[in-house]
Amino acid sequence: MPLELELCPGRWVGGQHPCFIIAEIGQNHQGDLDVAKRMIRMAKECGADCAKFQKSELEFKFNRKALERPYTSKHSWGKTYGEHKRHLEFSHDQYRELQRYAEEVGIFFTASGMDEMAVEFLHELNVPFFKVGSGDTNNFPYLEKTAKKGRPMVISSGMQSMDTMKQVYQIVKPLNPNFCFLQCTSAYPLQPEDVNLRVISEYQKLFPDIPIGYSGHETGIAISVAAVALGAKVLERHITLDKTWKGSDHSASLEPGELAELVRSVRLVERALGSPTKQLLPCEMACNEKLGKSVVAKVKIPEGTILTMDMLTVKVGEPKGYPPEDIFNLVGKKVLVTVEEDDTIMEELVDNHGKKIKS
């Protein structure tokens, strides 16, 4: 069983704990604080466990030329990439306001620290856990510094190889045992054939002492629900108030109705996963009573007869007697009284104390 860890105060993940559902707001708030608050409330009302943003200190995430390059996409909020990103970036004070709002609403609040200085700010903000975006998963100095902060870590694996993920594990594990990996493919929207849910199972084999989850960028909810059925203990999906809004993430995001349905479906699947123990359940008793079969006499069997297979058959009997799986054990035993043809073979009719007699 994968290791359990306390990802947020009082909220454990892994083992038999419910899947932790992260509503990734990212920058789908359009740079509007009120929209961001509406999305936090929406995440809570739909049943998500956590509302998550993306925090960057732009001069530490991008070099000058990257910020100055022209940005002419239909999704652009400025003439340069820097202007575009600044429009979408909340200040430290605004982050504190959003954190307070999430606390009022009653949902956990965190963000991906998109650079080392952003991680420093989030650490100061006292977020419950750090989310490592796929773009920083192979940034080993960043990983080391983040791990040393001591907070739980959720690490996405988009754009990475299995060899890289093994290195990530080896770097983080000695510094901070409280982390998990998310299978992720960095494409928006993600096509089903590129999801590779089987990586979840491979991660579970290679890293059996950490929880494994899934970060999805596909459309719809079916694939994410399947990830939970495969054992994903953390599930992250982007959310939006309107898929048609400006921004490259909106088309791969879930609107309120979809998020609510995702949460309902995940919780339903968790109930359906149930127990690995196979046994006759109380809910099956009525069906078993009506349709369950018993061993019956194929012919009239006189008192003292040693039972052979050609004397026995299996039918729905009234009353119930030996279940079909006991039929081979009855062969070689003696009947204590005469059993009429088509009667149920009852326990009191058979000598169960003596040894089986070879016929």
From Swiss-Prot:
CDD domains: SAF_NeuB_like (cd11615). It catalyses: aldehydo-N-acetyl-D-mannosamine 6-phosphate + phosphoenolpyruvate + H2O = N-acetylneuraminate 9-phosphate + phosphate; aldehydo-D-mannose 6-phosphate + phosphoenolpyruvate + H2O = 3-deoxy-D-glycero-beta-D-galacto-non-2-ulopyranosonate 9-phosphate + phosphate. Ubiquitous. The modification Phosphoserine is found at S275. Its EC number is 2.5.1.57, 2.5.1.132. It holds the Pfam family NeuB. The modification N6-acetyllysine is found at K61, K74, K79, K290. Catalyzes the condensation of phosphoenolpyruvate (PEP) and N-acetylmannosamine 6-phosphate (ManNAc-6-P) to synthesize N-acetylneuraminate-9-phosphate (Neu5Ac-9-P). Also catalyzes the condensation of PEP and D-mannose 6-phosphate (Man-6-P) to produce 3-deoxy-D-glycero-beta-D-galacto-non-2-ulopyranosonate 9-phosphate (KDN-9-P). Neu5Ac-9-P and KDN-9-P are the phosphorylated forms of sialic acids N-acetylneuraminic acid (Neu5Ac) and deaminoneuraminic acid (KDN), respectively. Required for brain and skeletal development. It is linked to Spondyloepimetaphyseal dysplasia, Genevieve type: An autosomal recessive disorder characterized by global developmental delay with infantile onset, intellectual disability, skeletal dysplasia, and short stature. Skeletal findings include flat vertebral bodies with irregular vertebral plates, irregular and flared metaphyses with vertical striations, small and irregular epiphyses, premature carpal ossification and small carpal bones. This is N-acetylneuraminate-9-phosphate synthase. The gene is NANS.
